[in-house]
Curated annotation (Swiss-Prot):
Coiled coil: none annotated. It comes from Caenorhabditis elegans. Residues 455-466 are annotated as: AF-2. One of its GO terms (molecular function) is RNA polymerase II cis-regulatory region sequence-specific DNA binding. One of its GO terms (cellular component) is nucleus. A zinc finger (NR C4-type) spans 30-50, 66-86. SUPFAM superfamilies: Glucocorticoid receptor-like (DNA-binding domain), Nuclear receptor ligand-binding domain. The lineage of its organism: Eukaryota, Metazoa, Ecdysozoa, Nematoda, Chromadorea. The gene is nhr-80. The keyword Zinc applies. Transcription factor. Binds to regulatory elements and regulates transcription of target genes, including acyltransferase dgat-2. As part of a lysosome-to-nucleus retrograde lipid signaling pathway, acts as a direct nuclear receptor of oleoylethanolamide (OEA) and, acting in concert with nuclear hormone receptor nhr-49, activates the transcription of genes promoting longevity and mitochondrial beta-oxidation. Required to modulate expression of delta-9 fatty acid desaturases, thereby regulating lipid metabolism; in some contexts, acting in concert with nhr-49. InterPro entries: HNF4-like_DBD, NHR-like_dom_sf, Nucl_hrmn_rcpt_lig-bd, Znf_hrmn_rcpt, Znf_NHR/GATA. This is Nuclear hormone receptor family member nhr-80. Signal peptide: none annotated.
């Protein structure tokens, strides 16, 4: 069983043993995830989050596979990673009706009939939120290491437009050892980030504006580095795609690997837009850089392909493309360094997560340049929270707060009519991005272990940064113990590294 499988099994047993809610008609718990219910959605008592999940699943005709393969995963609102397949089955088994999901209605200038008998009855029943039990509070505090936001999607678009507010929970993360933090980052699926637009943030330049400028610089640098068009057309910072259709060319994996350090350097320059970066130590900065590189390698091809408008091509950062329609076509040919078979085995799954999970959401909402910039910044900083030392995590939380506040202000300044809907869609996309990131790391570790092809040395160090940092921390602790005259024994318990008694 993999580490992730063991983690999910432990979480499942813990939640099952600690939470046994009485089955009574007077309970106001969600029948799917045991959160506070907000009403009857699709004929089943549930919370807004489960209702939104069910609506999207039915409306988009999604199908899921159980993450453990057993189809018996526990579903609880406090868990970091909820199996979507088992959650959907639980929605159906508890009475949710797919027929109740209606297609999107045109905008009609009519108000919602609030004062109906059923509405008054529902509001009276679910108006009082049931307090968390002691066990629930303990599990949330112990199990959540990332500030968690729950932007619960209301039952209808009208609710979104009228409420225009976000339900936010930010539990205090428990103190964990550095080794636990490093190793957990590769197996734990991150929660959606949790700042409040009302949270206090230090005064300064608008953070979204800063990242928009940096993103435009990034596009200009890519044209200079990788485009072969006339020199007079290379300069200029704008919000358009850095490449035109005639600029893109078939991707050669070998050539892309040779330029990998250039891409990492561009990401580091992007990251330095954050002033507080210099307050972190070297390991914290490197941890944040690792997450930023990973997020850029997932989101940049998604947005470049969206901007180019070629649905059968995935455009990489250097302007190279691979075919998304024919996995034996352009970009998937045999190369000296890597065979076409290995390309398809390790990179088609990553590509499909981009084209099937990330890009459709961008296309459905017709994501703007500003929204993409905010999405990428949110994913980088919230994803990097896990591996930053506990003493500096408040800086990450403040930055995430600033980004979300800035995005909300951007909507207001541009008179966006569907603020809550678009804001919520941005936040909900983070889950798929983090899942794709975990799979990306695991695939490349397998490539390294089985020597499928030679990865760049810097990439290998970033992939294994958690192990490197754990080793450094252990060696530092051993040296400190030896100076204090404490016996330190290695993992095999056969080599004595320190002496309890110092001989004079």
């Amino acid at each position: 069983m993999t580490a992730e499988g063991r983690y999910l099994e432990i979480r499942k047993k813990t939640v099952k043993s600690k939470f046994r809610f009485p089955a009574s008609s007077s309970s106001t718990r969600c029948l799917i995830c045991s959160a506070q219910a907000t009403g009857f959605h699709f004929e089943a008592q549930s919370c807004s989050a489960c209702a939104a999940f069910f609506r999207r699943t039915v409306a988009l005709t999604k199908s899921f596979k159980c993450i453990t393969g057993r189809d018996d995963c526990n579903v609880h609102y406090s868990m970091h990673q909820i199996c979507r397949s088992c959650r959907h089955k639980k929605c159906l088994s508890n009475g949710m009706k797919p027929g109740g999901v209606q297609p999107k209605k045109p905008n009609i200038e009519t108000g919602r009939a609030f004062f109906t008998k059923s509405g008054l009855k529902r509001n009276k029943k679910f108006a009082n939120v049931s307090p968390q039990t002691a066990d629930e509070q303990k599990l949330v505090v112990e199990g959540v290491k990332v500030p968690k936001i729950e932007v619960q999607e209301p039952n209808s678009l009208e609710d979104l437009e009228q409420d225009n507010e976000f339900v936010i929970k930010t539990p205090t993360p428990r103190k964990i050892s550095s080794s636990t933090s490093f190793s957990a980052s590769t197996t734990t699926n991150y929660s959606t980030p949790g700042p409040s637009p009302m949270a206090p943030c230090s005064a300064g330049p608008d953070v979204l504006t800063l990242f928009i400028r940096e993103e435009m610089k990034l596009g200009e640098r890519r044209r200079l580095l990788f485009s072969e068009r006339a020199v007079g057309t290379l300069l200029g910072q704008n919000k358009h795609c850095p490449y035109k259709k005639e600029d893109i060319k078939p991707l050669v994996f070998h050539d892309f690997r040779l330029t990998i350090k250039t891409h990492i350097m561009l990401v580091y320059e992007w990251l330095q837009t954050w002033p507080e970066l210099q307050e972190l130590d070297d390991f914290d900065r490197m941890s944040l850089l690792r997450k930023a590189v990973l997020i850029h390698f997932l989101l940049d091809p998604s947005f470049l392909s969206y901007q180019i408008g070629e649905p059968d091509k995935l455009i990489m950062q250097n302007g190279g493309f691979i075919s998304t329609a024919d996995h034996h076509g352009v970009g998937w040919e045999d190369e000296t360094d890597i065979s076409g078979e290995n390309k398809r085995k390790y990179y088609v799954p990553i590509m499909k997560q981009i084209t099937d999970e990330i890009m459709p959401a961008m296309e459905a909402m017709k994501i703007t340049f500003e929204e993409f910039v905010a999405l990428k910044a949110l994913a980088c900083f919230q994803g990097g929270f896990e591996n930053v030392s506990e003493a500096k995590r408040h800086l990450i939380t403040q930055q995430v707060n600033r980004i979300m506040t800035s995005l909300h202000t951007h909507y207001l300044e541009n008179s966006e009519e569907k603020i809550a809907e678009r804001f919520g869609t941005i936040v909900l996309m983070l889950s798929n991005i983090f899942t794709a990131g975990n799979d990306f790391v695991q695939n490349h570790r397998e490539i390294d272990i089985f020597h499928i092809w030679d990865l760049d040395k810097l990439v290998l160090q970033l992939l294994n940064l958690d192990k490197i940092m754990e080793t450094e921390a252990r060696e530092t602790a051993e040296k400190r113990a030896m100076r204090n005259g404490i016996n330190v024994v290695n993992n095999n318990n056969d080599v004595l590294l320190g002496q309890a008694k110092l001989e004079k």
